[in-house]
């Protein structure tokens, strides 16, 4: 994508699986070679749209909680093939989907995101119309809380819904 569409900006928001030190180092090298690739640590705001990976949906997280959570992930090494096979089996059996459905119901999940935003972005409700995030693997769109619409693009994992979403951009990015 970077080579074939070098005239476009590609924004990559790091998530927990991306925080492994060797991976982030490789991404930094890649982005230094390709100026069209923009790497964002926790969020990207473009106009009145906010994009997050979504780890803050695990529990009510403030910024220091997110930093600790990601630090733990950064220390991980690649899982052995047996873990990947076990994860794949759980997906085939529907266990992963069942867990996600129980642990990430929309109202609870969106309230966790709102709590996180309250801690990291003062007055976000006045600055944001739409918040896009992932992590939970559960697709939904236009869940409204306090006038802000929340969207989750789901997951491309077998048995989960994947929901690519369109949005309109009006100005230049502000990000962290």
Sequence positions of predicted segments:
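Extended recognition/assembly regions associated with phosphoester-bond processing machinery
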Residues: 1-176
